[in-house]
């Protein structure tokens, strides 16, 4: 009778225990489930701290759901991920709700992972992501969770009743392990993990070596482990050091210092010339390279001074003053491109100097003036700038030519000794100067000297006044004087049988002043060729009309030759100068190939014959022989000129003008 009485009591107690366990599990489940009202807003939940659901600030800010909670085994009461309500968990009071509470006892009695006897700080803060794979103890804080302690104490009162829930819990725990193996790939078998007795937990630290071998911890170890050696190994470490600019990398470079490395990486000596950061490219072009080097005074890098290493000073002089011919062959396109590229700050600063003092360096007058000047002069030839602000280039060039013959000084002294002033009538001076100005306009159309006229035009008056103060004449004044001296030499040789052979050499200062006044208008706009021919005809006819009172012209048929017989005694006649014109024409045909030939006054020919291959042209017969003029060669020139007169008179005046026009068109085309 005792036995039947005991069975109903046991069943009743079991029911009561199951009810209490189910109610406790339900409370624990609610406590771990997030409040949907709190997730929406902390003010939405009216219960506040008394709410039976979880209010977690971390979960409210974190939109991700807890992976372990969805699988039914989240053991972290302060999990930072969301624990949404699970469907059927509230109604199902069977095994699934008990999973979230009872695995603590199961892991405590049957540890599957070697755990250290240290509580997990991340678990207590709700941020441990390892779950049951953590090597530290996941024990809740008893002060924070007072509701779980009576639930855990009640099953311990009855050992018979406590065994069954524990067995049920262990059986139910196997199901989540199977689910984890399906979802998480690469999980090792829990039974294969080393088992450590409860008495040997304190020795587990030495056995495991602080790094557990379970799978949940492997991704973190593999990320950290190979990462640290990668900074010290060869290839990858150097890439990282170069990427992040390590200071140790500067000590390599094949054992060289930082200064050596910087010097080797410099693209050139002219990178920071004049602190011009925008113009710091490596100049391989000849014009920019030469300009930069001359501004800095480095003549050895300049292409015009390529022979300086040989020590040939004569070659240095020829290269310096013959470089314009070499630059001339390079074409206008390259010159235009280089000039556009040089439109920089220094180009704008020296723009006025370039316009005013751009004179061909092959000109003898410029060379003479340059030697007399105390400071350097800036010039521009073909779009290439040269400047020597400290006159170091000029001084070095003058010192390099101490052993060479003083050709410039000899020619200047010879010219100064022989130049004399002669008188001319106002009518003659006007016509001849107009012809010279017209010839200057025609020559200005040539490409090699196209900009010379415009650049010298604004400098005439300034040079004239400045040179008078310095004590020597301007280049244009010396050129006019040399032209007059050249004209007077053949004429005197032709008229040496007459009582006054030096009559044509005199020139008054008054008319020279008038010619200087007219020279201001000599570089006006170019005139058409028809206008030039008209002026030449008017000058030829006007000269004979103005001097009709003093001249008588007679024709002599012998040899079909026109001879001009002058009867003037005090004034200079104009018609005999036609013979001088023929002299210059014949000489230019013989010695200057391809040059324009004009049948006009000798003053016109002065612009045609004063330069020959970059050197100043002197007529035949003008040679220095003990300070006296050699007239023998000059007489031969006169004879050649008379033959030219004969040929010119036979052709006729109309045919001569047509020939001139044809030749001019061919030269311009």
From Swiss-Prot:
GO terms for molecular function: DNA binding; mRNA binding; zinc ion binding. Residues 1-23, 150-175, 285-306, 376-589, 642-669 are annotated as: Disordered. GO terms for cellular component: nucleus. SMART domains: ZnF_C3H1 (SM00356). The keyword NADP does not apply. The keyword Repeat applies. This is Zinc finger CCCH domain-containing protein 17.
């Amino acid at each position: 009778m005792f036995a039947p009485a005991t069975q109903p009591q046991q069943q009743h107690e079991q029911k009561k225990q199951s009810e209490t366990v189910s109610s406790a599990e339900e409370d624990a489940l609610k406590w771990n489930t997030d409040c949907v009202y709190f997730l929406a807003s902390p003010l939405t939940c009216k219960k506040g701290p008394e709410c039976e659901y979880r209010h977690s600030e971390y979960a409210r800010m974190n939109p991700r759901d807890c992976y372990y909670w969805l699988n039914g085994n989240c053991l972290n009461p302060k999990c930072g991920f969301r624990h949404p309500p699970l469907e059927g968990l509230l109604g199902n009071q069977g095994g699934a709700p008990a999973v979230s509470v009872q695995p603590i006892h199961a892991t405590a009695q049957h540890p599957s992972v070697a755990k250290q006897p240290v509580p997990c700080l991340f678990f207590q803060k709700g941020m441990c992501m390892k779950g049951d794979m953590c090597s530290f103890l996941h024990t809740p804080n008893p002060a924070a969770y007072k509701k779980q302690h009576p639930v855990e104490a009640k099953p311990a009162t009855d050992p018979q009743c406590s065994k069954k829930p524990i067995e049920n819990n262990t059986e139910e725990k196997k199901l989540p392990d199977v689910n984890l193996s399906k979802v998480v790939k690469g999980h090792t078998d829990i039974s294969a993990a080393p088992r450590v007795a409860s008495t040997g937990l304190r020795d587990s630290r030495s056995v495991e070596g602080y790094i557990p071998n379970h799978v949940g911890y492997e991704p973190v170890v593999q990320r950290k482990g190979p990462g640290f050696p990668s900074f010290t190994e060869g290839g990858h470490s150097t890439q990282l050091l170069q990427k992040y600019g390590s200071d140790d990398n500067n000590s390599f470079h094949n054992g060289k210092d930082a200064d050596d490395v910087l010097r080797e990486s410099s693209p050139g000596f002219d990178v920071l010339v004049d602190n011009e950061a925008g113009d710091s490219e490596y100049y391989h072009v000849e014009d920019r390279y030469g300009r930069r080097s001359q501004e800095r005074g480095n003549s050895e890098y300049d292409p015009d001074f390529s022979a300086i290493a040989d020590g040939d000073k004569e070659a240095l002089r020829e290269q310096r003053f013959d470089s314009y011919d070499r630059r001339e062959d390079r074409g206008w396109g390259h010159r235009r491109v280089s000039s556009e590229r040089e439109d920089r700050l220094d180009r704008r600063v020296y723009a006025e100097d370039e316009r005013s003092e751009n004179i061909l360096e092959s000109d003898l007058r410029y060379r003479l003036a340059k030697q007399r000047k105390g400071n350097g002069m800036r010039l521009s030839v073909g779009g290439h700038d040269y400047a020597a602000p400290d006159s170091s280039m000029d001084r070095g060039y003058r010192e390099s030519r101490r052993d060479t013959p003083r050709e410039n000084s000899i020619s200047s002294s010879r010219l100064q000794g022989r130049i004399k002033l002669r008188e001319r009538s106002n009518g003659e001076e006007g016509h001849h100067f107009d012809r010279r100005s017209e010839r200057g306009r025609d020559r200005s159309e040539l490409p090699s000297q196209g900009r010379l006229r415009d650049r010298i035009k604004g400098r005439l008056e300034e040079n004239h006044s400045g040179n008078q103060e310095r004590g020597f004449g301007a280049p244009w004044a010396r050129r006019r004087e040399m032209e007059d001296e050249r004209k007077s030499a053949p004429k005197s040789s032709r008229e040496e049988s007459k009582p006054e052979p030096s009559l044509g050499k005199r020139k008054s200062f008054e008319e020279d002043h008038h010619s200087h006044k007219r020279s201001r208008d000599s570089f006006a706009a170019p005139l058409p060729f028809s206008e030039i021919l008209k002026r030449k005809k008017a000058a030829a006819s006007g000269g004979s009309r103005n001097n009709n009172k003093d001249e008588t012209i007679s024709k002599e048929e012998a040899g079909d030759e026109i001879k001009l017989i002058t009867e003037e005694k005090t004034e200079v006649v104009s018609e005999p100068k036609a013979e001088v014109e023929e002299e210059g024409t014949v000489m230019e045909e013989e010695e200057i190939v391809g040059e324009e030939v004009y049948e006009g006054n000798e003053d016109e020919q002065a612009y045609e014959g004063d330069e020959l291959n970059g050197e100043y042209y002197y007529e035949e017969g003008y040679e220095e022989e003990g300070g006296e003029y050699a007239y023998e060669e000059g007489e031969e020139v006169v004879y050649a000129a008379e033959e030219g007169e004969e040929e010119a008179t036979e052709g006729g005046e109309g045919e001569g003008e047509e020939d001139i026009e044809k030749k001019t068109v061919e030269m311009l085309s």
